[in-house]
């Protein structure tokens, strides 16, 4: 099974990715992991990527796509993979189609975990962190026993500046705009599957499992 996982920040992609790879024993491939592995192995493309990253510059598409091609050609991807964080643009998605064609494979599904932006805002702005020990809480989903006080060490809880409502709302808006052309592209190809991410996390996985189970 060859899968792509999509979803806005706070949609619960990480949790679902863990469950998919654990059950189906396929590699979870994120852009960051690919870059790190290529740089560590000092491949030609890895060294090129490193030169851009060290300068604080974006890695050009041709380098990223080359690294993706190398990674998907590896032995552990023979039975499938879960791509996360790539592609990000229609140009990258088109390049991925070419890679898959060259490898004699195709993408089976693009799983988009759908969550209303209002709920995402609540999920992302509710996080609180202990100033002393770094423990993480959530006002709704994992609240401390006593408001603003860490259960573990009694330290004061605070909200990170980039978790405030305005910053999070802007981040979501940018993500929605960037993601829409990609979703349209995959819908046209017939790969796109929308998953209700507003349910309990086990129910979300059960829905994914029913969908992809036939591919195993």
UniProtKB/Swiss-Prot annotation:
Protein name: Adenylate kinase
GO MF term set: adenylate kinase activity; ATP binding; zinc ion binding
Organism the protein comes from: Bacillus cytotoxicus (strain DSM 22905 / CIP 110041 / 391-98 / NVH 391-98)
GO cellular component: cytoplasm
Subcellular location: Cytoplasm
Family: Belongs to the adenylate kinase family.
Region (LID): 126-163
Function, as annotated: Catalyzes the reversible transfer of the terminal phosphate group between ATP and AMP. Plays an important role in cellular energy homeostasis and in adenine nucleotide metabolism.
Lineage per the UniProt record: Bacteria, Bacillati, Bacillota, Bacilli, Bacillales
UniProtKB keywords: ATP-binding, Cytoplasm, Kinase, Metal-binding, Nucleotide biosynthesis, Nucleotide-binding, Transferase, Zinc
Binding, Zn(2+): 130, 133, 150, 153
A Pfam short name: ADK_lid
Record has ATP-binding as a keyword: yes
Catalytic activity: AMP + ATP = 2 ADP
Binding site for AMP: 31, 36, 57-59, 85-88, 92, 160, 171
EC numbers on record: 2.7.4.3
Domain observations: Consists of three domains, a large central CORE domain and two small peripheral domains, NMPbind and LID, which undergo movements during catalysis. The LID domain closes over the site of phosphoryl transfer upon ATP binding. Assembling and dissambling the active center during each catalytic cycle provides an effective means to prevent ATP hydrolysis. Some bacteria have evolved a zinc-coordinating structure that stabilizes the LID domain.
Keyword Aminoacyl-tRNA synthetase attached: no
